[in-house]
């Protein structure tokens, strides 16, 4: 497990056992989304204990990187999935109600870009910012 520190957030990168993270999806749904596609929070993990263990380890590492050493409970909200084909993408977005978020890459490579969510706040205050932030 490694910690990556940036100017706006710290990230944890860790290997997980994908065989222990098997899940099922209820109902038919599109696996590739954009902002106009209704998303269903419908994943059920076959081993939720392992998922929580991974999240706890990552959260503990993040909290330690900020020198935060206090007790907390971890609540895992409904989880959704994206499956991308060539040239698919997810528009940029924020998880404004969550303290932490995670991504599990099942196979392949990713062009994931993390942006400072403060930019959305600045855009709301200065909407005519000429695309520079």
What are these regions (language model features)?
Residues 37, 47, 76-77, 116, ...:
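Intrinsic-disorder/low-complexity coil detector
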